[in-house]
């Protein structure tokens, strides 16, 4: 950003079936890193390698096409519309082509319910408004949506912030469920070390745009 270097020498590895926690206080560089990995910002130096191939992101679509899905704090959900409509949100299944296609509502309902069940949330009514769901359920909806639409790397931006303790535990259980699928790498952005310790396999600590520590879960035991 001009003469200011937001991230300097930051390096991290992520692997399918693992949670890599990225920790740091406000201003540490977590937001800049997540926006770079998700294509909002373009890196001015360094490299991003996905499945052995170097990639360059000029837009969020580039990152999405490479299999990187990001769930931000605001979740990009419409509280007044249904679970199913939020799950597909612009990528609805339709009969026919053009602006007058009919929505395949039953198929979309079935997919939304099944995908959320895979990671631990059972929805009895996919037509319920998202605003009636708990914060933890809304997080699960956003995560399930990212996975269904091809995320191989799932970036979670402060997923437990602004939630009550019970809802925080719901979200942590969801993260463990995704981890157990075995084929998705998870980057958990958080400032809550307790939550990170409950789910993460690897840790990277940031301060003022630089890595000040890293290690495996077993390194932090005790």
Question: PLM ranges: what are they?
Answer:
Residues 1-222:
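Glycine-rich phosphate-binding loops of nucleotide-dependent enzymes
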């Amino acid at each position: 950003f001009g003469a200011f270097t937001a991230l300097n020498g930051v390096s991290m590895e992520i692997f399918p079936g693992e949670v890599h926690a990225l920790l740091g206080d406000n201003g540490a560089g977590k937001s800049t890193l997540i926006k770079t990995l998700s294509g909002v910002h373009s890196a001015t130096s360094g490299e991003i390698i996905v499945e052995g191939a170097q990639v360059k992101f000029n837009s969020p679509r580039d990152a999405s096409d490479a299999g990187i899905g990001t769930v931000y704090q605001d979740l990009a959900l419409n509280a007044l519309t249904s679970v199913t409509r939020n799950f597909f949100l612009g990528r609805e299944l339709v009969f026919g082509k053009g602006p007058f296609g009919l929505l395949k509502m039953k198929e979309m309902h079935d997919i939304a319910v099944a995908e959320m069940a895979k990671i631990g949330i059972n929805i009895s009514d996919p037509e319920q408004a998202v605003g009636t769901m708990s914060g933890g359920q809304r997080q699960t909806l956003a995560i399930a949506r990212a996975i269904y639409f091809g995320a191989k790397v799932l970036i979670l931006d402060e997923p437990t912030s602004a939630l009550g303790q019970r809802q925080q535990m719901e979200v942590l259980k969801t993260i463990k469920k995704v981890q157990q699928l075995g084929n998705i790498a998870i980057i958990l952005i958080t400032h809550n070390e307790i939550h990170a310790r409950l789910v993460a396999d690897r840790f990277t600590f940031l301060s003022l745009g630089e890595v000040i520590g890293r290690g495996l879960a077993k390194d932090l035991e005790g």
